[in-house]
Regions:
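ATP/NTP-dependent adenylation/nucleotidyl-transfer catalytic domains that generate, transfer
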Residues: 150-152, 210-211, 236, 260-336, ...
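Enzyme catalytic cores with a strong preference for nitrogen-chemistry domains
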Residues: 1-334, 350, 361
Length: 594
């Protein structure tokens, strides 16, 4: 057996900021060298950020990526880090003639090995995901190479992200090609329970291939996606050896005992990949002789977050990175005293600090004194900025000019509030946070250009019952501080905001249950219809009331046009409103209850 010390660089790149991403790669490679690493592995497309979407269809962007890769190799050598082998992700291109159905320029989701100022080998993702949030058939052509480099007597293979999730391809070839270690750069977005699925997958692939696997995952928020890190090292027998933290950057350094190289030959050869394709295996040698034995480091296995803490951390990171990466210094939101705006304000305070959160209290003639009191109580507990802007006078002015009644009059109040928030955003440069939850978005219980107006929607993918669960969990953390918890001495959310019956307060005595069933009845139905794509017959067979099924399906289907105009927000479920669920607005198909 031979020893290797490997550094897994779980970083948070910014899409399109090639210079900053490259500087970070150099910085973290230096940190890995200080800790005695023999190899440093970065995440998928760590040089360009991920996902880059249609940027890869621009020749200028692909050329910039290729130039940045060469410049990075030179810079690492100039910084005295040339002896450190470094695996980085970037955008490459294939030498293919243009053809119909092929992405312009034939881009590749590439991974490269840099050593001694040179790009030694290049690889690219073979399996292109085209489901859920992924559209990689649109953006990339598949790679067909498996690089294996010999480092201190160990043969190390490189495969990218989805190649680990699918059968066949480079991972299937790695073991037969003699690899003792498989490194996989990843940009695998978060959703609930995915961490358990991910560990089970990596363990199974390790056992199948007979290779230890390094799974290096991106961390950070990128528009609707949140990347949770949670990088893994698994032995050839499938046992967890080391694990990085969730939702935080980390340099995870681990020592492994690995089998010495079995094959002597270098160069290239072709082999069947088990998925009907042929993979070209490319062997190169960096160093043939194993290292002298040394005292290994004790491996680190980060404490895993329980589900509620995991979801809350994802929401905080999403808000923090959306604000930071888009150049905002502060956020603004309407604070009603209800639970949705209370949770949104708390997430924002935890993300960027209460001093950068601005709340606007906008009571109408229908707002209760206790709601205004609850909003003021939250402001006091958290120390956020606030201002009071009563809306009755503005609403009255509208109604003098335009005669409105019923729902139109109710929605006018929400639209006045939205206009006030957008005006203050324009004046002061705040990012407007909308406060709607997934249950409301599903059934259209929101006002277009009113409470839906804004730039980012932190709880867009959070069902109402989970809003309450997250709020109670956050209050239970009072007195604690950390990466995702501002150190509030008292529970940051007033208890009355959690316990009172929800209401939009747009008419006298209004309650959500005037229009909707109880949320503990509604949310399971929405979960089954939206996230599990059950039809009406399946929903009834699952135990949902037939009349309610018919009513809720109709509401969900008719609200598609509203959701298309809603701001982006972080995905935390297997199917969010946005990238995951794509339905026509003009659509006459209706489910029927059988």
């Amino acid at each position: 057996m031979a020893q290797l010390r490997i550094a897994l660089a779980q970083t948070n790149p910014a899409v399109g900021d090639l210079a900053a991403n490259a500087a970070r790669i150099v910085e973290w490679t230096g940190r890995a060298a200080e800790r005695g690493a023999h190899l440093t592995v970065f995440t998928e497309m760590s040089l360009t950020g991920y996902p880059v979407e249609d940027l890869v269809l621009r020749t200028s962007f692909v050329e910039a990526s290729l130039a940045a890769l060469e410049a990075l190799a030179t810079r690492l050598a100039e910084e005295g880090l040339g002896e450190m082998p470094v695996v980085v992700g970037y955008v490459d291109r294939a030498n293919l003639a243009p053809r119909v159905g092929q992405p312009k320029g034939a881009p590749l989701d590439g991974a490269a090995l840099i050593h001694r100022g040179q790009v030694v080998v290049r690889s690219a993702k073979h399996h292109l995901p085209n489901y859920g949030v992924f559209d990689e058939y649109r953006y990339f052509v598949r790679g067909d190479r498996l690089p294996i480099f010999r480092l201190h007597g160990v043969d190390v293979a490189i495969a990218v992200c989805e190649d680990l999730w699918q059968e066949g391809g480079p991972v299937a070839v790695a073991a037969d090609a003699g690899a003792g270690l498989l490194v996989t750069p990843n940009a695998s977005p978060y959703e609930r329970e995915k961490d358990d699925v991910r560990l089970a997958l990596v363990s199974r692939r390790a056992r199948e291939s007979g290779c230890a696997i390094l799974y290096v995952n991106q961390v950070g928020g990128q528009d609707e996606l949140v990347f949770d890190g949670d990088s893994l090292v698994v032995s050839a027998s499938g046992e967890l050896v080391a694990r990085a933290a969730q939702f935080a950057e980390e340099l995870l350094v681990v020592d492994l005992d690995l089998p010495e190289a079995r094959f002597g030959g270098l160069g290239t050869f072709e082999t069947e990949a088990g998925d009907g394709t042929v993979i070209t295996v490319e062997r190169v040698e960096l160093s043939a002789r194993p290292l002298e034995p040394y005292e290994p480091l004790t491996p680190t296995v980060a404490e895993h977050l329980e589900d509620t803490a995991e979801v809350y951390s994802a929401l905080v990171l999403a808000v923090r990175d959306y604000v930071r990466k888009n150049g905002f210094q502060s956020v603004i939101l309407g604070l009603s005293g209800g639970i949705d705006s209370a949770l949104t304000a708390t997430i924002a305070s935890d993300a960027i600090g209460p001093e950068r959160v601005h709340a606007v209290l906008m009571p109408s003639r229908y707002s209760s004194e206790h709601s205004l009191g609850d909003a003021r109580e939250l402001v006091e507990r958290q120390g956020i900025n606030s201002r009071l802007v009563p809306i009755s006078g503005v609403v009255d002015a509208f109604e003098k000019e335009i005669e409105l009644s019923g729902l139109a009059a109710e929605n006018l109040q929400a639209r006045v509030r939205g206009t006030i928030l957008m005006g203050l955003s324009n004046q002061h440069g705040h990012l407007v946070l909308t406060t709607g939850n997934k249950s409301e978005l599903a059934v259209g219980y929101s006002t277009l250009y009113g409470d839906s107006a804004g730039g980012f929607a932190p709880i867009k993918d959070v069902l109402k019952t989970l809003v309450w669960e997250l709020s109670r969990w956050r209050n239970a953390q009072a007195g604690r501080s950390g990466e995702f918890l501002y150190g509030f001495a008292r529970p940051p959310i007033p208890e009355n905001s959690i316990e009172k019956e929800p209401s939009a307060e747009l008419r006298p005595g209004q309650r959500d249950t005037d229009s909707l069933p109880e949320y503990d009845v509604l949310d399971p139905l929405l979960h089954d219809y939206v996230e599990k794509d059950m039809g009406s017959a399946e929903l009834v067979a699952a135990g949902h009331d037939p009349a309610l099924v018919a009513r809720i399906i109709r509401l969900v289907d008719l609200a598609e046009y509203k959701r298309r105009q809603y701001p982006p927000g972080p995905k935390i479920t297997p199917k969010n409103f946005g990238r995951d669920r794509r339905l026509p607005i003009t659509n006459r198909w209706r489910e029927t209850t059988l």
